[in-house]
Amino acid sequence: MTLGEKIEQVVTGRPDSHVPARVLQRLTGLPERPGTQPLPVNWAMHFGQAALLGVLRSVMAQSGLRGPVASAKFTVVRLTNDQILENATGVGAPPTTWPRTELAVDVLHKAVYGFVTGAVADALAARNGPGPGERHAARRPGRHADAGPLPRQGR
């Protein structure tokens, strides 16, 4: 996502966003200042959120929630996480108030993150074989309302 953002910024001339730093400053009580924010604070929030939410995508994959549909769901979680933090701290405004181009760029970058993270998480989880959800679905392929749970393992 970061590489894609940097390429997009070169092409569009869009400046760096300091929203991640401002959110972290408000969450932690760090002092705020106008204008450009310290790069380490910006990156700490940027990469910290990515790492923490990446764990969630890994849990999804290990559980058997894999593939593009799971990555799309995760992308929504990633977008929602940003909006909760930005709006709760007063740093951001609801996306419905943003210019459409800014909204499109944000959604695009989060989608890249969501699908790349999903591909990596899915590949790593696949090394352990099907997840519990996939094993359950394989017992009776298709859509069924009466699919009971898998038996407990090790008992």
Where are the model-predicted features located?
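Short amphipathic, positively biased membrane-proximal segments
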Residues: M1-R155
